A protein has these predicted regions:
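Internal alpha/beta loop-helix hairpins
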Residues: 1-57, 79
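Non-catalytic connector elements of ABC transporters
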Residues: 39-41, 49-163
Length: 163
């Protein structure tokens, strides 16, 4: 069982207070996002109020609090990334935030599988995707094969890149 409210501290100071769900889904810093679970981080640059350029890809996300040209870190939880073999096209209205990737490794963890992806057009780091085992069986995932990933804009957190 977990507490009703969590106080997250760093260097002796409280940096966020909220319910477990609030802290997990709306962490107010990369430190908290990474501390309260696994997170994929992708570096990018703001190009307009709803878009960041990450590698070779434009990602739709909420960049309204950042200036054009500002370096940012996009963050998305492994369970929020959607896998598909279907190529999304501009005519079906879902082309935004769809990236081609290659499956690097699949780790079976019982009720879910963790899939490590090489999404080179987006980031040089491997991305992690957690998918229920039943869904993974339906997709017939195999290492060294291509897959399409979708990053739902509503699940992407944007942070200033402080590096």
């Amino acid at each position: 069982s977990m507490a009703d409210r969590i106080f997250v501290m760093k260097d002796g100071a409280v940096i966020q207070v909220g319910t477990p769900r609030e802290i997990y889904t709306t962490a107010n810093s990369p430190f908290i996002a990474d501390f309260i679970g696994i997170m994929n981080f992708v570096s990018g640059t703001v190009v307009d109020i709803h878009t960041a350029r990450c590698g070779d890809s434009n990602i739709t996300c909420d960049t309204q609090f950042y200036a054009n040209g500002q370096n940012v870190r996009l963050a998305i939880r492994p369970e929020s990334v959607v896998l598909s073999h279907a190529q999304k096209s501009a005519t079906d209205g879902t082309s935004s935030n769809n990236i081609e990737a290659t499956i690097d490794e699949i780790e079976f963890l019982g009720s879910f599988e963790r899939v490590y992806l090489d999404a080179g057009s987006l980031t040089n780091n491997l991305m992690m995707v957690d998918i229920p085992s039943t869904a993974a069986r339906g997709l017939e995932l195999n290492a060294n094969t291509g897959i399409n990933i979708h990053l739902p804009a509503s699940d992407i957190r944007v942070y200033a890149d402080e590096a």
